[in-house]
């Protein structure tokens, strides 16, 4: 995976906050580690929807909240959009992966 190139792109070209860039980099490194642990191909063009879906399921089983998982999905979605624009991949594995539903929060007035 081209995580370093992507984070530099976010920082210098897209002008993302350093905290966001660090979080996205961490999320992508975690995903790459998951692929390695599952003995799945970690090359950008070889990553498919099933690998992404397996990671999302793994995160939920680890107790992550839907909002935390959605942030990680957002990092992957941005990464694969970056690769598409650079011509490194032809199809994004994120095309079928939507965000998780989050519980509706209501505020009670005082």
Predicted regions, residues:
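Juxtacatalytic substrate-recognition/specificity segment
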Residues: 109
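N-terminal core-binding DNA-recognition domain of tyrosine recombinases/integrases
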Residues: 4-19, 25-106
């Amino acid at each position: 995976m081209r995580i370093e190139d992507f984070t530099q792109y976010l920082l210098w070209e897209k002008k993302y906050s350093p905290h966001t860039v660090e979080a996205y980099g961490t999320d992508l490194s975690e995903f790459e580690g998951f692929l390695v642990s599952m003995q799945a191909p970690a090359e950008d063009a070889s990553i498919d929807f099933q690998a992404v879906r397996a990671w999302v399921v793994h995160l939920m089983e680890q107790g992550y909240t839907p909002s935390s998982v959605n942030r990680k999905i957002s990092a992957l979605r941005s990464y694969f959009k970056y690769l598409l624009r650079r011509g490194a991949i032809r199809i994004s594995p994120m095309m079928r992966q939507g965000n998780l539903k989050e519980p509706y929060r209501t505020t009670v007035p005082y």
